[in-house]
Amino acid sequence: MSKSLHVSYNWNTKKFLQGAKAAYDYELKNSRKRFLGWIFIALTQFGVVLALKQGTIGMLTLSTILVLYWYGFRWKIREYFLIKSFKNSPLKDKSFEVKLNDEGLFFNNSPIDFKDIYEIVSTDEGVLLYFIDNYIFIPSSAFENLEDKSEFVKIIKRKIKGE
């Protein structure tokens, strides 16, 4: 690798929420939980049938509340608690820098072994570097352009595979 990539960004509430949402959406997409919304909708339909046939609205009420939560309030509630925890975080408003060069990958001048990264995910919001028990989010705005972001992801993917 001849080109050195260097990105830096300030870790503020907006970027924190972007990263949390990107990770949440990616992890939900690959989880069985993604089917819960469909189950709640099916329960609502069953509740409508019960309400029309037997006049009972218990199932309809409960399933409607679940659908509203799942599709309307789930992220808002999560966002509230994330913001609350971020306000007390020691990482709030810190500057981070990531360097990728011939010597390796560095986060705030600390080396990251490519063997410790088990997956890299590129989203519109940024790049997620997944480790065993956590992840690092690098917002798209930290990269100079889309080509640098694509190159960063491509190089990391090659290094993870051991090439």
What does each model-identified segment do?
Residues 1-45:
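N-terminal membrane-targeting/pre-transmembrane regions
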Residues 103-127:
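Phosphoinositide-dependent membrane-docking surfaces
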Residues 72-111:
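Conserved beta-hairpin
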Residues 51-67:
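Hydrophobic alpha-helical transmembrane segments
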Residues 128-163:
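A membrane-cytosol interface segment of integral membrane proteins
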Residues 3, 110-111, 134-136:
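Short acidic/polar mixed-charge low-complexity motifs
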Residues 46-49, 69-77:
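Canonical alpha-helical transmembrane segments
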Residues 13, 113-119, 140-144:
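A short, sequence-level motif marking secondary-structure junctions
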